[in-house]
């Protein structure tokens, strides 16, 4: 009985630590992605992130639509270099809320959803909420 309790506690602790690591990895990926793809003169400060969550509800048509929509935002660089290849069956997503200070010095609060591969190595698409 004691072994079962110890095993359960160890397993739970491992899941919590893995989850925290993935959350941090996803947040870092989003920050790096925006630092690379915001137009020059825009500065962002992050306020909050939601929990990292899996989804299987995004298809290639929706990905293309999101990419096209975001390309027309004045604070985002055009021609973002997204990963090529087939879309994974399951994507991970996280919402980020941040303040964007543009060239005019005016703050704008933005909330966007970022879709990533399961390994959390690349942003597949993102959208304005």
Predicted regions located by residue number:
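Sec-dependent bacterial lipoprotein signal peptides
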Residues: 1-20
């Amino acid at each position: 009985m004691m072994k079962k309790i110890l095993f359960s506690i160890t397993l739970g602790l491992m899941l919590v630590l893995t989850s925290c690591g993935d959350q941090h990895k996803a947040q870092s990926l989003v920050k790096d992605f925006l630092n690379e793809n915001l137009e020059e003169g825009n500065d962002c400060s992050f306020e909050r992130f939601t929990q990292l969550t899996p989804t299987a509800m995004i298809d290639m048509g929706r990905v293309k639509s999101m990419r096209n929509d975001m390309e027309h935002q004045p604070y985002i660089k055009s021609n973002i270099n997204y990963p090529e290849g087939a879309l994974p069956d399951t994507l991970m997503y996280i919402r980020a809320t941040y303040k964007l200070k543009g060239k005019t010095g005016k703050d704008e609060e933005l909330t966007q959803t970022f879709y990533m591969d399961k390994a959390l190595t690349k942003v597949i698409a993102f959208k304005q909420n």
